[in-house]
Amino acid sequence: MIRQCLSRRGAYSRYRLAARGVELAEPFHHQSSRPQGRRNWSSSPRCSLDIRTDTPRSRSEYVPLRKQLKEEAKAKRAAKRKGSAPPAKHDDWELTVGIEIHAQLDTDAKLFSRASAAIDDIPNSNVALFDIALPGSQPLFQPSTLIPALRAALAMNCDIQRVSRFDRKHYFYQDQPAGYQITQYYEPYAKNGSIWLQEHDGIAREDGEGVQIGIKQIQMEQDTAKSQELPSSTYLLDFNRVSRPLIEIITLPQIHSPATAAACVRKIQAILQSVGAVTTGMEMGGLRADVNVSVRKRSEEAGDHEYHGIVGLGQRTEIKNLSSFKAVEDAIIAERDRQIAVLEAGGTIEGETRGWTLGSTETRKLRGKEGEVDYRYMPDPDLGPVVIGEDVICDLQMKMPLLPDALFQMLVRNPKYKLSTADAKTMIELDDGQRLEYYQDVVDILIGLQTDLSADFSGGKAVGNWVLHELGGLLTKSSLPWDSGRVPAQSLAEIIDLLSRKEITSSSAKSLLAMVFDGDKRSVAQIVEDENLRFQSLSRGEYIALAEEVMRQNPKMVSEIREKGQLGKIGWFVGQIKRIGDANRVEAQKAEEILRELILKKNS
């Protein structure tokens, strides 16, 4: 049972956009004045806001995250070529990091209106009256939005609060027409959680085999409008995103290395994706992180500052809006080094908000203490408390899917899969779990195809290689996103089955995969017959003739193998046999056996 106690207070006056010094270039079209104050605008004329401000801002154009990451990597490679100094060691200093993660919940409805939560539709097509803060409209909490939030909290071992409340966080900006954001500052719905980071998660070496990170609280809050900057300080606003439900996850400052901080964000994203709580990951803008960074001298007395109940810390700074795991790690490194340099020079650290640009080597100041906003938190008088029944919590706990740690152990230990540590980790992290689901489908189909071969299936590792590396390589080369329908699981399983039965060669299997990937609608069996890909092994005599030919052409390398024991060069000879013979008929293992026999036998 989820119940929202309604407030009896009347409508609370909203700030008009005009009071904030902005201009409506084109008004919203409104055809009805229904007292409920809720409406889906999908059937209304398209409405847009053109907001002009007098505040000068940068005119940088929007750059997709994928391109930003490529530019960041390019900048770092350029810095290395210039002979940049190796990273400094700071053994005398203790770094402390706390993280705040904002994640978009995967829901159909908005948090406080019945409008659709879809944000990729036509701009301003999913907008209720409350979303744009029209006078008289009131928030209407949608209980369904709480379900993914509860799954996220339970997955991170939080204590669910039976009663939670919403508060107003006041600030003025064009993306928030009400003049405040609704959040849960005082009484969040979840507290006192924790996650466990292990070595395979990518934590720092000094953290040993594992480290536990506390979760102070998780709170629900509404998202803001999406703004697009145009020349002449003009902004276009899309209110489809307003009131889309978010959760903010606040960790305790128990992280002491940049690598572990990045691993923490990565692990939280994996947890959220595994329980279906979020829409997309960091790479698509579904998550963003703020980090709080402080340092203190190990040899000196504890610092004077306290943060979330942990005392003895140095003065912290906050770095806002980090959009990738690499950005989290690099920004912390840069800010740590900056703070240490300031303190070693006799200066002091100011509590301030700082920013980070992809590819940069240092953080930049956004605002200091004097510029900090007084948010004037207050309970929202239009929203009553949210009461969560024990039956809801128990039901969600019973239906909880496997979490990343359990998935990892299953993939590396279950004989059905037996993936390497690296492949298991990658499989879990890719494509919001869709790649893992596809992999498991291929394995299950392949098991059905190979019931006649052996009672003990051992093809899971081979399937992992094909899903991650062969199919993944085609996706990367073509710059296409993941789509399980491009190569159906049945088709890939049939290709791997033919290869394991030695009915086709490895090169033929890759050709088959490429043809299916490119849209060939024929069945795998039909392609094999039409393209004459079925493997016809060479006779022993043919193998010997080819081996003797490549040995005759390369006597020096034969001598090096015989006299110096450079057996690794036999692989090169196998490649030459494939080159001068029919590659689709050459079996690498048999070719190597013949070569070893001829080269080493004559040596003895």
From Swiss-Prot:
Superkingdom as given in the UniProt entry: Eukaryota
InterPro entries tied to this protein: Asn/Gln-tRNA_amidoTrfase_suB/E, Asn/Gln-tRNA_Trfase_suB/E_cat, Asn/Gln_amidotransferase, Asn/Gln_tRNA_amidoTrase-B-like, GatB, GatB_Yqey_C_2, Gln-tRNA_amidoTrfase_suB_CS, Gln_synth/guanido_kin_cat_dom
Chief site of localization: mitochondrion
Disulfide partners: none
Keyword Mitochondrion assigned: yes
Catalytic activity: L-glutamyl-tRNA(Gln) + L-glutamine + ATP + H2O = L-glutaminyl-tRNA(Gln) + L-glutamate + ADP + phosphate + H(+)
Annotated GO biological process: glutaminyl-tRNAGln biosynthesis via transamidation; mitochondrial translation
Residues in the signal sequence: none
Protein's recorded name: Glutamyl-tRNA(Gln) amidotransferase subunit B, mitochondrial
Top-level enzyme category: ligase
Organism of origin: Ajellomyces dermatitidis (strain ER-3 / ATCC MYA-2586)
Presence of keyword Isomerase: no
Similarity comment text for this entry: Belongs to the GatB/GatE family. GatB subfamily.
GO molecular function, one term: glutaminyl-tRNA synthase (glutamine-hydrolyzing) activity
Job description of the protein: Allows the formation of correctly charged Gln-tRNA(Gln) through the transamidation of misacylated Glu-tRNA(Gln) in the mitochondria. The reaction takes place in the presence of glutamine and ATP through an activated gamma-phospho-Glu-tRNA(Gln).
Region feature Disordered, mapped onto this chain: 28-57
